[in-house]
């Protein structure tokens, strides 16, 4: 994931910073405990595409 992109995108639910999970290849919002998939290198930042994750 491009670091420049990570600096400008935000969670579409709460507008907080997203983190990239290198192992799972997804974007994580720690505040909302949700993940957003990345398909073909494109982050899918739609509320309906998010899924819950366990608090880490």
Swiss-Prot record:
Q: Which Gene3D superfamilies match?
A: 2.20.25.10
GO CC entries: cytosol
**Could you tell me which InterPro entries the record lists for this protein?**
Trm112-like
Q: Which Pfam families match?
A: Trm112p
Q: What family does the Swiss-Prot or TrEMBL record give for this protein?
A: Belongs to the UPF0434 family.
Q: What is this protein called?
A: UPF0434 protein WIGBR2520
> Which source organism does the UniProt entry give?
Wigglesworthia glossinidia brevipalpis
Q: What is the lineage of its organism?
A: Bacteria, Pseudomonadati, Pseudomonadota, Gammaproteobacteria, Enterobacterales
